[in-house]
């Protein structure tokens, strides 16, 4: 097994591993540390079933069930811990997964919860070639790039994270459309979080739509968020995953943002995703 750090603002790759094989605890610990150090890690050429996907995911902690989707159903009744990300519909015209084929804008997963998931794991079952790429941005580097005046403003701010819409902009089942950002439903989180293990600060933004900075007028909140998001998504702090079947990607959900490109609606894309329960300290 080989650990390769990419020449990029974040990400690495693990080679010569088969997740169908028995993996000893010492190797598990090395994998977890490599993910923690590089924030996003790719493992290619994995051909595993859903049981193995859950088994591998458990390396990182307790599985966290996916959030509500617009259809209000479990896509895989035998595996409720797995979310299906897909544009495919079954013979009855019912989607077999979430998020469709459009762009999924920059976000971190489920930050509208008090305890959003710590890790995300995404496995490519079926993908169109050179489409639907996923981009990741390093929130340590985003904070580093902020001008000092913005750091002073944002350091003690709290942001409301919208729970009504998903990252594709679809209204979740049981929610109403947000009329004003300051009325947004969802958790309230610090805009800046310090990792106690390395004492480094990072931005924690969730999603841009319907976000609101507590204590500010709406126009002030909008301007501040727009300024911060400019630095959070600049190309020089990002890395892009061009998917192939059998790719498995692990990322630290609370340390990065990610987005997905749109792809041809006539193509087929099926991804299986798990996530790991977080905690109150958001680390």
Predicted regions and their residues:
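Fe(II)/2-oxoglutarate oxygenase catalytic core
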Residues: 2-250, 254-283
